[in-house]
């Protein structure tokens, strides 16, 4: 039962007037959703201003929406995901950022055993609407510690959805 899952709005585009890079489109989408949803919060590693995330996807959002809704977390991935799960179960809409896919492994148990199975384990009484933003691949030529593509591990987990932004 996905009745309480994220509803995707139908949007029609007449024409695209501005060309922007994908990370700026992500920033615009996050900003737009925060304007429409007072329960949405963003937190993670270096997401608040002035940095706005390692790739600047959240740049300007803590200034625009306040440090109560966009804030930095400790560099502790399991803590980020665990906190997001708890907040989602209490009607918040957390969007969390893990700086690089390579860093997600300390949180894998919570994603697999808690987040992904919440609806099933509660017989549809609970849902856990968490968005985990994770840059993947070799964009910065980071080698061993910044270039993993983790989607193959996560795509087989029932209870989660994987989305890649695209033009």
Question: Predicted segment positions?
Answer:
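Thiamine diphosphate
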Residues: 2-166
